[in-house]
């Protein structure tokens, strides 16, 4: 079965195939092979982009979408995630896309349930579909990754986006730079080099900003102090390369990690990332569903969980 737990679980060839498929779908390729199949979305963490992006992707594929309120499920009664997935498998759901607040939650599922598991974000761990949409956005801009310099700024320590992107970008031939407060640094991440914010911005083809995850911090820095010291200000943006682009996984804290006027500037690709997310998730769902059919005959459904 083709689970999607981390970016490292995908080969370079598989990554490029997913980008190619997502690009074709964005250009209007019709895909009705999943029409009528059931997909269930279950979210245990607040989500706007991931949740609704998956729902739009599913509906574009012609699927029947079941959106479940996490507060009304038996998880609130103490049911394990494993038993929840097995229950859904038993009633005809054939794949799961899961977000859970626990790091590497998928280890209790992969190889133990009979349907593919797609990770939509695990704690401070990984966020592979976000990484894929970021890669698609970069690929659209530059036609590849080899030789590019991508700087990732902000809360590296708590960011599953940083963790996923740093690994895969390094593997695809890009140079990864990190920048941010010392308390946000992740010394366990071997895929980037820490440099001072101004130097990182000057060197970068892609300036990727991260949200401060206030919910994971006990001490908070003032918004204006953070922007002036570590964020992308108007003055810093003037030192970007002419063709450099600005990216952010969102939600964006305007005036904190990025000056408000830059969010929708000429160099920003923030909303294009969101657009690309729909097509990437269509490609991911199609891949999981089709590859699952290699192991299980008959019609199948897809289940999306976010915890």
Swiss-Prot record:
GO biological process: 'de novo' pyrimidine nucleobase biosynthetic process; 'de novo' UMP biosynthetic process; amino acid metabolic process
Listed GO CC annotations: cytosol
Superkingdom of source: Bacteria
Binding sites annotated in the UniProt record for carbamoyl phosphate: 49-50, 99, 127, 130, 250-251
Keyword terms: Pyrimidine biosynthesis, Transferase
Pathway where it operates: Pyrimidine metabolism; UMP biosynthesis via de novo pathway; (S)-dihydroorotate from bicarbonate: step 2/3
Gene3D superfamilies named in the record: Aspartate/ornithine carbamoyltransferase (3.40.50.1370)
Reactions catalysed according to its record: carbamoyl phosphate + L-aspartate = N-carbamoyl-L-aspartate + phosphate + H(+)
EC number: 2.1.3.2
Coiled-coil ranges (or none): none
Record-listed L-aspartate binding positions: 77, 160, 211
GO molecular function: amino acid binding; aspartate carbamoyltransferase activity
Enzyme class: transferase
Biological function: Catalyzes the condensation of carbamoyl phosphate and aspartate to form carbamoyl aspartate and inorganic phosphate, the committed step in the de novo pyrimidine nucleotide biosynthesis pathway.
Family: Belongs to the aspartate/ornithine carbamoyltransferase superfamily. ATCase family.
Assembly information from the UniProt record: Heterododecamer (2C3:3R2) of six catalytic PyrB chains organized as two trimers (C3), and six regulatory PyrI chains organized as three dimers (R2).
Protein's name in the database: Aspartate carbamoyltransferase catalytic subunit
The species this protein was found in: Bacillus pumilus (strain SAFR-032)
């Amino acid at each position: 079965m083709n689970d999607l737990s981390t970016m490292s679980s995908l080969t370079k060839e598989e990554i490029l195939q997913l980008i190619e498929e997502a690009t074709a779908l964005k250009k209007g390729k019709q895909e009705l092979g999943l029409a009528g199949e059931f997909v269930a979305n279950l979210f245990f963490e607040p989500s706007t982009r991931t949740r609704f992006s998956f729902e739009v992707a599913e509906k574009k594929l012609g699927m029947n979408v079941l959106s479940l309120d996490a507060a009304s499920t038996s998880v609130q009664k103490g049911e394990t995630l494993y038993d929840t997935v097995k229950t859904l498998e038993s009633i005809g759901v054939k794949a799961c896309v899961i977000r859970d607040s626990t790091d590497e939650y998928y280890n209790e599922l992969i190889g133990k349930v009979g349907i593919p598991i797609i990770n939509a974000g695990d704690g401070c761990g990984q966020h592979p579909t976000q990484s894929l949409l970021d890669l698609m956005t970069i690929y659209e801009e530059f036609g590849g990754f080899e030789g590019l310099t991508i700087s990732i700024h902000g809360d590296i320590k708590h960011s599953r986006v940083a963790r996923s992107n740093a690994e895969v970008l390094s593997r695809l031939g890009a140079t990864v730079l990190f920048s941010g407060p010392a308390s946000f640094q992740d010394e366990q991440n071997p895929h980037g080099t820490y440099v001072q914010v101004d130097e990182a911005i000057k060197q970068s083809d892609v300036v990727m900003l991260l949200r401060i995850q206030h919910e994971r911090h006990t001490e908070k820095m003032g918004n204006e102090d953070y922007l002036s010291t570590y964020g992308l200000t108007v003055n810093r943006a003037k030192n970007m390369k002419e063709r450099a682009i600005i990216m952010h996984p969102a939600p964006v804290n305007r005036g904190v990690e990025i000056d408000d006027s830059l969010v929708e500037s000429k160099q920003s690709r923030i909303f294009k990332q969101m657009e690309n997310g729909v097509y990437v998730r269509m490609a991911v769902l199609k891949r999981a569903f089709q590859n699952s059919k290699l192991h299980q005959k008959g019609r199948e459904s897809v289940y999306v969980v976010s915890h």
